[in-house]
């Protein structure tokens, strides 16, 4: 393929290795596992002026791109110098030269460097161009894969692990895992602030690009350009367990830092929050399908709810998650990680280590599949059109060890990228909860008004409040134009802890929160432990939004001026404070 063999010739090998020793010295002394998040394989070729490989839309570097170069790659200009350009401010690729220490938790640094090798010609890294494609790579459901496929996947992964012998090989298993560590645990800064690819609209495109290169690296290691990653089909009852190929001890796909209680076919809880709950298997599966319906349909009618909050350059990181990143993405991480035996939930239960478990990529393949599935549901479910999103950039190595810049705008169509998903039924599509636990409307007069309950210092018990809607009896046209959003402002909590709370409408605090398959269940908030390097008190503050138009219809509350809302903490609630709650109408 023409582009994948384009070289970025290294001016000197010496400068490459010396640029690593400072950042990566601890990496060499600790050969423990690293992380798996997306670059691919083969040897460093770097050229001092290889910027001829530019995507079609980038033939003319516009001001936005030039700014990316200055701020992101060269690191020569401070963000303050460029502040007037705030009207066009996509996130640039990270400045590899200033990549620093990643943090496991507050005051605890990752004991090795998560920084990638720095190409010699760092200031002229080209844009990636898709190589010619003969046939689509079809990603299969992991639980249904045959032995021939499993053998190929195991071989590719073991070959990738063997590349760890050279700790600076960007295609090595640990270097691939470290991509996630660097982008997610505070090693990079952009515009003077920490770069974080979770908790915002960067979540889906970053992980799609990460898996794209990871998959191509695996294929190149077994000389199979059609090789495709499997997806963990946790949204279907047949896939609601660790896929067998990952549960064989001694296999390259096995990781011993997993929760041992969740092996051997244990049904996964897509709302898992770090505590074992004695819920019957059928109820867990029912809850799972309910959660999928809520996250894909009810709570994500518009792009902003699905993708997450806007994150242009210069804003604080982690402005807010989209629905799928929140659930089931985060609970699957927590459920898989070994929180009983590992202090920080390693490997899957912490961003810095998640890529060290091969199942990470399988999990994220299904997360990525949800992007495609969501757009198929219809309505206003389409990609964002904001230029700051479309022009945001990341840095990856391809399977030939060539460094590239990639843009969000180039990953919106999986087929154009050369891959697709083997179809599986999606039973959650028709799993709208209709069972009601409340006949009629709950008496809101007997429930404290929102202004008396908030600000709330700690969510250490279930609380109920009544809240007034901005408009009632809305017409179909009004609903199509604007979504009704239940908004929790300044939800603050310790970001080193697991957090989950559930939200119900039209019930009081006697609600049975273990059964989610009911019309009153509105949604949940979750958080995986993570840290911001410059955040010494480790308190994160987010805005949590739930789309409730469909819920109001299903509960017969469309004509009501005031409704009841109940919050039920599941874990970490004693550390959660909420400043205020309101209902807003937002353009879809």
Swiss-Prot record:
Its EC number is 1.10.3.1. It catalyses: 2 catechol + O2 = 2 1,2-benzoquinone + 2 H2O. Belongs to the tyrosinase family. GO terms for molecular function: catechol oxidase activity; metal ion binding. GO terms for biological process: pigment biosynthetic process. Keywords: Chloroplast, Copper, Disulfide bond, Metal-binding, Oxidoreductase, Plastid, Thioether bond, Thylakoid, Transit peptide. This is Catechol oxidase B, chloroplastic. It comes from Solanum tuberosum. Residues 1-88 form a transit peptide. It comes from the Eukaryota. Binds 2 copper ions per subunit. Catalyzes the oxidation of mono- and o-diphenols to o-diquinones.
């Amino acid at each position: 393929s023409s582009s994948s063999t384009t070289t970025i010739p290294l001016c000197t090998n010496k400068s490459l290795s010396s640029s690593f020793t400072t950042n990566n010295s601890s990496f060499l002394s600790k050969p423990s596992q690293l992380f798996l998040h997306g670059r691919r394989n083969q040897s460093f070729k770097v050229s001092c002026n290889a910027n001829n490989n530019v995507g079609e839309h980038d033939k003319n570097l516009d001001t936005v791109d030039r700014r990316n170069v200055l701020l992101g790659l060269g690191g020569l200009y401070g963000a303050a110098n460029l502040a007037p350009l705030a009207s066009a401010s996509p996130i640039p690729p990270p400045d590899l030269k200033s990549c620093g220490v990643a943090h496991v938790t507050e005051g605890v640094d990752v004991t090795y460097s998560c920084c990638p090798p720095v190409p010699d010609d760092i200031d002229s890294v080209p844009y990636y161009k898709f190589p010619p494609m003969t046939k689509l790579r079809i990603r299969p459901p992991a639980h249904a894969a045959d032995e021939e496929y499993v053998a190929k996947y195991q071989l590719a992964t073991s070959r990738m692990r063997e590349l760890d012998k050279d700790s600076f090989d960007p295609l090595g298993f640990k270097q691939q895992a470290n991509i996630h560590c660097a982008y997610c645990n505070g090693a990079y800064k952009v515009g003077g602030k920490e770069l974080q690819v979770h908790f915002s609209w960067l979540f889906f495109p970053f992980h799609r690009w990460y898996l794209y290169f990871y998959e191509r690296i695996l294929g190149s290691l077994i000389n199979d350009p059609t090789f495709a990653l499997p997806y963990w089909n946790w949204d279907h009852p047949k896939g609601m367990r660790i896929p067998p190929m990952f549960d064989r001890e001694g296999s390259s796909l096995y990781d011993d830092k997993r929760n041992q209680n969740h092996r051997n076919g244990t049904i996964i809880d897509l709302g898992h929050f770090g505590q074992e709950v004695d819920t019957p298997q059928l109820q867990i599966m029912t809850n799972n399908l309910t959660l999928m319906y809520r996250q894909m349909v009810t709570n994500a009618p518009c792009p902003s709810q699905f993708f997450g909050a806007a994150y242009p350059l210069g804003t604080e990181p982690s402005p807010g998650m989209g629905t799928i990143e929140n659930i089931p993405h985060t609970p699957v991480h927590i459920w898989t990680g070994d929180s009983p035996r590992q202090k920080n939930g390693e490997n899957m239960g912490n961003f810095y280590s998640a890529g060290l478990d091969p199942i990470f990529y399988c999990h994220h393949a299904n997360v990525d599949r949800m992007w495609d599935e969501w757009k198929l549901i219809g309505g206003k479910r389409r990609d964002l059109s904001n230029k700051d999103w479309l022009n945001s950039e990341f840095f990856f190595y391809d399977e030939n060890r060539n460094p590239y810049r990639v843009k969000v705008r180039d990953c919106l169509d999986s087929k154009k990228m050369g891959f697709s998903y083997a179809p599986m039924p999606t039973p959650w599509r028709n799993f709208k909860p209709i069972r009601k636990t409340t006949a009629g409307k709950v008496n809101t007069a007997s429930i404290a008004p929102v202004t008396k309950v908030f600000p709330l210092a700690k969510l250490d018990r279930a609380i109920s409040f009544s809240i007034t809607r901005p408009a009632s009896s809305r017409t179909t046209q009004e609903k199509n134009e604007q979504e009704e959003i239940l908004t929790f402002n300044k939800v603050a909590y310790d970001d080193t802890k697991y957090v989950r709370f559930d939200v119900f409408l039209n019930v009081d605090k006697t609600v049975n929160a273990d059964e989610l398959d009911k019309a009153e269940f509105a949604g949940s908030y979750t958080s995986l432990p993570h840290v911001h390097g410059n955040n010494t008190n480790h308190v994160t503050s987010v805005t949590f939004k739930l789309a409730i138009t469909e819920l109001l219809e299903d509960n017969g509350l469309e004509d009501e001026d005031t409704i009841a809302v109940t919050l039920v903490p599941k874990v970490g609630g004693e550390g959660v404070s909420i400043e205020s709650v309101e209902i807003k109408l937002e353009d879809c």
